[in-house]
UniProtKB/Swiss-Prot annotation:
Assembly behavior: F-type ATPases have 2 components, CF(1) - the catalytic core - and CF(0) - the membrane proton channel. CF(1) has five subunits: alpha(3), beta(3), gamma(1), delta(1), epsilon(1). CF(0) has three main subunits: a, b and c.
Superkingdom of origin organism: Bacteria
GO CC aspect terms: plasma membrane; proton-transporting ATP synthase complex
Protein name as annotated: ATP synthase gamma chain
Amino acid sequence: MPASLQEVKRRIESTKKTSQITSAMQMVSTAKLSQIQKHATSYQVYATKIRSVITHLSKSHLLDSVNTTSKNSDGKVNTLGMLRQRPVKTTGIVVITSDRGLVGSYNSNVIKETLELIENNHHSTEDVAIIAIGGTGADFFKKRGYNVAYEYRGISDIPTYKDARPLVEAIVSMYDKEVYDELFVCYSHFVNTLTSEFRAEKMLPVSAENMGHDDLTSNDEGYSIEYETEPSEDAILEVVLPQYAESLVYGAILDAKTSEHASSSTAMKSASDNAKDIISSLELQYNRARQSAITTEITEITGAQAALE
């Protein structure tokens, strides 16, 4: 077999192996996407309810009487400090990306939109503190001189509520210590398998303005809801506020992971389809070259036979 034919055959075999790998990766991503969508659907009910509770408490002016400057005697983070508003000197930005590649344009879109958000609202990188969830985002912002105040790598492909707790504790602690004066969560929101959109949600300080009143019915408009609280407003909020923060961060992670798996599945399908096209082209090239080689051999044999006669 001529060297050119051997090279084409080698490329065909190599591309077939690549196609098998990308097809397997597509199947895995599709399975993960299906699984995480079930988690996201069931979780959305809880997330909507906890947001509604905080919104109602805010509208009832229950949050106005809370002492947000008090310190816990046990040394734990003051969760009521999540309500404290102060002049903004530094903005904290949570950026959710993946730890690895092979996810199409997922990471690049989130990073690009986050950079635009920063550049449009801040004059210097010193005004921003990055909280990176995912190694891709952490590495990107470190290389460009940003202050990566906290990074969280190795989060599960199907994250659990427990995964968000240490992250939320760190976020609230840094806000309480005035590492930043406001906090936004930036991530890719899953729309459908082929579409996602960038979102930047304000998480801290907690206020009704951040959440809107979408969860309130029209019958609530114009009324001030009165609550009787036991044992106290502070005791209730010390339980509810961390749950709200955890729900917001976990919801964003869950949404971002859904978008990541969808992007990965689409990217691997595209890679598999491209590999099939390349294989078809190479096989056609191989068959033509082989046919040409056979024709040449027959011509040479016929010519040699004629010369002998």
